[in-house]
Amino acid sequence: MATEKQQDNWIKEGRGQGYLKNYKPWVTVRDFGSKGRSHRVYGHTTKRTHHLLSDLELATFLLLDWNPSVTDIREQFPLPLQATTQIAEQAQITHPRVRNALQIMSSDFYVDRKDFRQPNFA
């Protein structure tokens, strides 16, 4: 979880923005200490290093990276704060906060594909 100041800095850094080799993940393996395993892996599809926070993310990434229909892989993709607060409100659950600052949540992956029927998925 990040403080409001950290989140503001990440936005200024351009995290969660860009495509292919210019994409910057919202969260990197260096941002937080972890009790689990994290990985920094080069992606052949995107031509950049990906920040993966678990072995399961690594396994998923490897399947995506070698799939010929995948055109872009963005990991730790930030979700719109307005949308996640609305979902939490509708579900009557508390949206994550740190020091009373709402947290920008992220999806493990946001993937673009050549398939016109389902060109994107998270």
Residue ranges of model-derived segments:
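Active-site metal-binding core of divalent-cation-utilizing nuclease and nuclease-like domains
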Residues: 75-119
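A structured, charge-rich N-terminal accessory region that forms the first stable segment of a protein
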Residues: 1-81
